[in-house]
């Protein structure tokens, strides 16, 4: 080795191993708080081990992965990192529960140009809080410090979740039929979808979202409100009634694109848009961006985070169980029969908005 050339280290290349190890130490307690009895061992192994919970006759594993889209850009711009982890968990676990699955464990991937231990620990603490709300274990993850791939301390997130459902109790929409009722659960705001449009509206309007107030709250807080996690109330509904025929997590694509994913070929969802008061944040976005009404429902959830299909005769019981679980449900529409070329989702009373 030439004595004239300085000795290079990984740190010189932009990767701080000590920072990575410091992060792991800080988040071990977060993972421990989420632990389920089926999880074997703590953080730090090469792989995470988890038993199938007792009591299942024919357990089927259900998996999902997701991110939080460009809501992350807004979080970075606002330097607000405490709830984006809950968004990440919600996007994954809500997709599992619509199959009837109980989430078991969750892993995250955090990639950054330069690791800021405080920011990363804040994000992972939010992931842990989301896992607690969903009843699943945070069993591991990957923190990748990749200089030259991301600008400064910018970071990207992905989440991965595995759940379990009894084979005979999988909810797949196959029993949906004309006359069934559709029940909605409210969202907390835009959740984690439509943020490229939202950011464009903010840019075009020139609004200072920290200063704009809607219903007495800063617009920035309304836009960063964490995605709701519906797992526990929905699992209670399934267990107590056995009445759930289908569920749709209202994400990117809104009501128009997500409900058809769980409908049989001849079924059409007829939605009464006048059945709920759209939160003010959506009205502000529509007004500032001059967004077409149908486009609003195709991009944003417009105040609806989850739609549940039950027989009309089970609707009142379902509403009762959901209210007892702390939800504020309402009947948003019904199922009708339709032809092959018909619209799969019909939005009535659009003019009322």
Swiss-Prot record:
GO terms for cellular component: cytosol. Pathway: Purine metabolism; IMP biosynthesis via de novo pathway; 5-amino-1-(5-phospho-D-ribosyl)imidazole from N(2)-formyl-N(1)-(5-phospho-D-ribosyl)glycinamide: step 2/2. One of its GO terms (molecular function) is ATP binding. It is found in: Cytoplasm. GO terms for biological process: 'de novo' IMP biosynthetic process; adenine biosynthetic process; purine nucleotide biosynthetic process. It is an enzyme of class 6 (ligase). InterPro entries: PurM-like_C_dom, PurM-like_C_sf, PurM-like_N, PurM-like_N_sf, PurM_cligase. It catalyses: 2-formamido-N(1)-(5-O-phospho-beta-D-ribosyl)acetamidine + ATP = 5-amino-1-(5-phospho-beta-D-ribosyl)imidazole + ADP + phosphate + H(+). Its main location: cytoplasm. Keywords: ATP-binding, Cytoplasm, Ligase, Nucleotide-binding, Purine biosynthesis. Its EC number is 6.3.3.1. It holds the Pfam family AIRS_C. Belongs to the AIR synthase family. This is Phosphoribosylformylglycinamidine cyclo-ligase. It comes from Pseudomonas aeruginosa (strain ATCC 15692 / DSM 22644 / CIP 104116 / JCM 14847 / LMG 12228 / 1C / PRS 101 / PAO1).
